[in-house]
């Protein structure tokens, strides 16, 4: 079983590391090509392209400039510990045991605009390059055209290595669009998280993102390997709703706190 999650815009390169083990990203030749394109952008162009403030554009121009091909614990940190968004608040990888990291390294993948696919312990230099950004490159008009089948092929390698054919899609639509479902050698299961608001259940972005992290943690902590085991997920008040679910979609609901 392979879990897919999105990266985060917020990064943490300060907190103490909970493991010293690391691996290197497997698609760095591709990353280097994107860095080459990104370095051509001025801070104002970055600001417009990414719809971010001038200050953030300056920070990210510096990140593109400072990026180097040699990754070490001095200039990079493990991806699962560097990302700090809502998904990662739910995941809480900073509390993982070494055995948890082992299982995650086999069964969890982070999709990335710059790195393509990251394993949890892959070192990552800081960046911001969302998958949906229209960064023109030698392969096309955006990052989806740049990555083409590369991400899907890498996921197929991971599935083959574990002798499995199930992908748990906990990534956002923006990121999962970089995967070619018809070329993926797997059944795709998508957990959906609905929160009650004024008597109606709906997707509330902040809660849904955190729940994706909670579900990832649930799978890792309990060493789950079969999709039917996911129905036992009950973190922070969520429960499985069989009536609302289908073969490819597992629906979890949570009542509003009264």
Curated annotation (Swiss-Prot):
Domain of life where this protein originates: Bacteria
Chain coiled-coil ranges: none
Any Pfam family matching the protein: H2O2_YaaD
Example GO biological process: response to hydroperoxide
GO cellular component labels: cytosol
Entry's family note: Belongs to the UPF0246 family.
Protein name per the record: UPF0246 protein YaaA
Species per Swiss-Prot/TrEMBL record: Escherichia coli (strain SE11)
Highest classification ranks of the organism: Bacteria, Pseudomonadati, Pseudomonadota, Gammaproteobacteria, Enterobacterales
